Every structure is written in C-alpha cells, then in structure tokens.
Amino acid sequence: MLLLATMAFGQAKEDAGDGKMLDKQTMEFKDYLPEIHGTIRGKYEYQTETSESRFEVRNARFSVSGNVHPIVAYKAEIDLSDEGSIKMLDAYARVFPVKDLNFTIGQMRVPFTIDAHRSPHQQYFANRSFIAKQVGNVRDVGLTAGYTNKGGFPFILEGGLFNGSGLTNQKEWHKTLNYSIKAQLLPNKNWNLTLSTQMIKPENVRINMYDAGIYYQNDRFHIEAEYLYKMYGHEAFKDVHAVNSFINYDLPLKKVFNKISFLARYDMMTDHSDGKMDETTKALIINDYAR
C-alpha cells in the first residue's frame, strides 16, 4: 500500500509548554502569567491502491503552563481534534527541590523511547512511526522523577510509577503498578543515545518492553535509528519487533519559509497487541491487523 500525504500546520516552540524551574528567588507579577502554546495540524491523504482520499485535522492541541512558585510548575494540555476526538493529554504539577532534580505527579506521557515522546510539532513526518503510534505510545497517570547532569559526561535520567489503566480509568485500585525508566546519554551536543525499559500490565498479561535509539544532529542533518522489543508473559503473544530509522536534511530558505526538508524513512513493525483480550477466544487481539 502506498500512502501519499501532504500536511500543513501551525506550531509551537521546540521546548514549548513543559514545566520549568525559574532561576530566581522571588517571583514578579509577569512570572505568574501562564504561557499558552498550540499546534494545529491538518493533512490531505491519497491512497493509490483504492483511489480514495481524505482531509483530516490530525491535531488541534492547546496547552497552558506556568509557575506558582520558582520551584513549582504546572501544565495542562488538551487535543480538541485527535482524528475527530477530544482528549485530555497532560495535567500535572512539577516540583524542583534542588537544581537539576524534579518530581512530577499527574497525567503525562510515560518516559519511554525517542520518537513516541515527540509532540506533533516535533514530528518529522506527516504520519508517526509504528513506535510512536502503537508500540511505544503510552500516556498514564503517575509519579516520575528526573535528574539532569550537565557536567563531565552529560546525561538525563527519568523514571516513574504509573497506574497502568490509561487516562480514563483513574479510580481503579491496583495491586501492581507499571514502571518506566529512560536514560539519555549525551557525549556531545550532536549525539544522543537513549535506552529505556517499561513494564505494563493492561489486563492479565505482563508486558515488558526494551528500547534503544541513537541520533546525530547538526545544523542541516538529523540521522536517527531506533529499535523496540516487546515481550509478553506466558508467551501469550509473539514477541514484537519494531524499527524506525530516518534521515532528514534541511535546506535553508531566505523568503516566506525558513527551510525545506528532504526526508527518507524505514519504518516496520511485526504483529502487535496492546494486551487487550478477545472475550470469545481469550487470545490477545492483534492491533491494526490490516496495516
């Protein structure tokens, strides 16, 4: 199947909306004012095999973030049109007890993988990769801790505990919490090596995921490769393998637009299940079987 897509979007800044620590002891009036960011992404797709086409508002995201104290930040984000559905995405408070250390509680994206952690305004392609869309795409409610080391050998370490019941079943009680750990190693300003692992238990089957990714970036090029391995407890489903690799070259423009990008990608995924069970057969359901 060949899918052609064009996309137009209005976007926020690269680091837009995340809760940040203020480098001051006392807040002024302007420091209490919230930041408002948004991403509106519309696209047109044409499917050559069936000669069918469609227009779609893929995202209409808006976020509000700010500080109530130099070391206490907040963020709330909603998508008014995620393929036609309204979804509450982020709703959290973040505390910075000391410099470079933070704790976050609330609803957020789980720290896992490279591509699944990108917001729509950071995506390189009109359609997300299989890792970002299916295999590694998790938002949940929980508590995370993050530490950034800027000296010596720089790195960012994140980890957290989560309900595991998604965004809509927050009142459920759990005997086992999900966890996720992510480490970013930054040998220099151009390289990023990311290693992460996650355990989830959506119903009765424990699922473990392991991800490794690396990218190189300079003023013109972004080259990235990522591999995700997913295994199911008691061999309830075949192990899943997913790969996302791409290259992006930016050509600067002087008028109207800032740049034009040339991209190529290899994206694959074996049969995948999110852990939901068929009520009749009691077997795990294959997601997006007709992909």
Name every feature range the model reports, one short phrase each:
Residues 24-164, 175, 183-192, 246, ...:
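Outer membrane beta-barrel
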Residues 169-173:
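Active-site cleft segment of glycoside hydrolase catalytic domains centered on the general acid/base Glu
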Residues 21-24, 255-257:
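Intrinsically disordered, low-complexity Ser/Thr- and acidic-rich flexible linkers and loops
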Residues 178:
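Conserved adenosyl
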Residues 1-20:
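Cleavable N-terminal export/targeting peptides
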Residues 15-22, 102, 208:
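An N-terminal domain-start capping segment
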Residues 13-14, 46-51, 69, 92-96, ...:
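Outer-membrane beta-barrel pore domains
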